[in-house]
């Protein structure tokens, strides 16, 4: 199933794999307890790339993504069950542990934004809007951390959203 959020340039790169065109995978982790977002790139060197105009932090600004070793499994583009993004980090560094410790002491969820770039064009992400999910589950052992990310739990949201109680709606009281 085609993904309408991808740019024509990255669709061509996926389809024909032209020589010299490299897809750069970036992740941005946001949490209320983080002083700054954690931005990483799956590469051996840091990159500076421009965020999209709708970015929640530093919109349309050139930011640095820190080189980091991670693996990711992108969600399928299907109409089936809720898609999941899997992120695996081996040999977790101290920098990441600081962020993980900050988030562990909070009930707020970590938001993750995946942005693919082309090495030849770092002026904007090649997916608009980028894929934004929340971390649902984290598994850790002495060698790696695996995070399962998904969209919000829409199936268990109350509908209608308003809770009709006597405080806000005193007319509900019957005599």
Describe the residue ranges of each PLM region:
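Short solvent-exposed strand/turn elements
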Residues: 143-165
């Amino acid at each position: 199933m085609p993904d309408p959020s991808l740019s024509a340039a990255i669709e061509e790169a996926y389809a024909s794999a032209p020589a010299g065109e490299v897809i750069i995978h970036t992740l941005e982790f946001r949490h209320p307890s983080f002083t700054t977002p954690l931005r990483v790139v799956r590469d051996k060197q840091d990159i500076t790339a421009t965020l999209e105009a709708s970015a929640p932090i530093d919109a349309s600004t050139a930011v640095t993504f820190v080189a980091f070793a991670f693996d990711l499994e992108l969600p399928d583009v299907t109409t089936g069950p809720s898609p999941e993004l899997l992120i695996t980090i081996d040999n977790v560094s101290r920098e990441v542990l600081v962020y993980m410790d900050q988030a562990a002491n909070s009930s707020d969820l970590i938001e993750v934004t995946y942005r693919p770039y082309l090495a030849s064009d770092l002026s904007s992400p090649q997916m608009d809007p980028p894929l934004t999910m929340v971390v649902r589950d984290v598994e850790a052992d002495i060698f790696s951390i695996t995070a399962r990310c998904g969209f919000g739990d829409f199936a268990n949201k109350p509908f209608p959203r308003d809770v009709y109680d006597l405080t806000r709606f005193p007319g509900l009281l019957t005599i």
